[in-house]
Amino acid sequence: MARKYFGTDGIRGLVGEGVITPQFFLQLGWAVGKVLAQQNGDKSGGLVLIGKDTRISGYMFESALEAGLISAGVDVGLLGPMPTPAIAYLTRTFQASAGIVISASHNPYTDNGIKLFNTDGTKLPDDVELAIEDQLDRAMTTASKLGKARRIADAEGRYIEFCKGSLPWGFNLRGLNIVVDCANGATYEVAPKVFGELGANVIPIANKPDGLNINLDCGSTKLNQLQKHVLETGADMGIAFDGDGDRVMFVDEKGEVLDGDQLLFIIASHKHKNGGCSGVVGTLMSNFGFELGLKNQGIPFERAKVGDRYVIEAMKNNGWQVGGESSGHIVCSDVTTTGDGIIAALQVLLALKAEKQSLHQLKLRMQKMPQVMINVRVTNKVDLDSHEQVQAAIASAEKRLDGKGRVLLRASGTEPVIRVMVEGQEHQLVASLAQELADIVGEAVA
């Protein structure tokens, strides 16, 4: 059954348009509450935690969700601004019926959306999302017994202790100078405290959210300021999160970027060396050099569809504990249930301290293959699989790569774009082929 509202990572869009309205969030809160009550045998929907990032519209949507849930007889715990993975963790440890995150991740403040977690801190299964969608199309009715709402005062401290507790006893970051870019988002309080309490000298940037500056020229998708600060301060590294804290990117002491593939490689290699990595899940977008680097160590590798829910599903199916995406979504399931930027960063730092090498030296252990990705904005939906001109262009590009690269066209699950990716041994050829393909795709969807 096709979904009407939920995408690959919840619901997301421009505030005030489509379903990103207070009216819809009120109805959504009620629908979630009704489904939870049904799961509990038509008893109370239990407790639902609500957290958010720092965008200004979060307060409006928090109130709407709260009202909808309470009207369905559900108790609500309000967490305030917290990273998405923190909300997953707290949902699990509070034994809540569900957790809701109000966020649009790495998007600008003009967007917002929601993600939902199950009672065990994992993304909601498809059948539950479909049940919620079914309720959304029904008229709201107030429960005979209303729920109550309360603020969770110690949420931040609980999550900080969880992050520190994920490391071996006695581990510290003393002697490291780290620039931390909080994207003016949900990690602005938590991230500097975690690294600082572990002994690092922390230089925080983009840590003054005003509701409008989340992800604005900062964070994991805009690394220029982080690179500049690392070089100017002579720091050992920089760490950047996205607006809701489930993605992470690093910058080494030379100002060079380490993406999700390179960070996963460092984590997996260290775990493998210590007998704790039976395999790694990447995605269709993972760099081929990453795959080769793992195979050279005898580490099995599998590609899943793009989206952390598919990565986690493949990890479970294989019984593996490490997986993630080039974008910086990294899952270490021996520690947490979902992508967690801070936990992933700590795993990289654990490897760095154990290897007694600089981040740049660790970066050089994996040779990335040149990869170019171009986003083509979509105005009309077109079946590219049956589009003769597009398919002919793909075949031509693959022939020119001569079996030493990859071509991938993929519709984004969160934006109205087609991602055109070409990978190969020679950057000039890769860039040329990617642009040629993007131009042809652009004509097809115009």
Curated annotation (Swiss-Prot):
Activated by phosphorylation. It comes from Saccharophagus degradans (strain 2-40 / ATCC 43961 / DSM 17024). Pfam families: PGM_PMM_I, PGM_PMM_II, PGM_PMM_III, PGM_PMM_IV. The modification Phosphoserine is found at residue 105. One of its GO terms (biological process) is peptidoglycan biosynthetic process. InterPro entries: A-D-PHexomutase_a/b/a-I, A-D-PHexomutase_a/b/a-I/II/III, A-D-PHexomutase_a/b/a-II, A-D-PHexomutase_a/b/a-III, A-D-PHexomutase_C, A-D-PHexomutase_C_sf, A-D-PHexomutase_CS, Alpha-D-phosphohexomutase_SF. Binds 1 Mg(2+) ion per subunit. This is Phosphoglucosamine mutase. Mg(2+) binds at residues 105, 242, 244, 246. Belongs to the phosphohexose mutase family. Its EC number is 5.4.2.10.
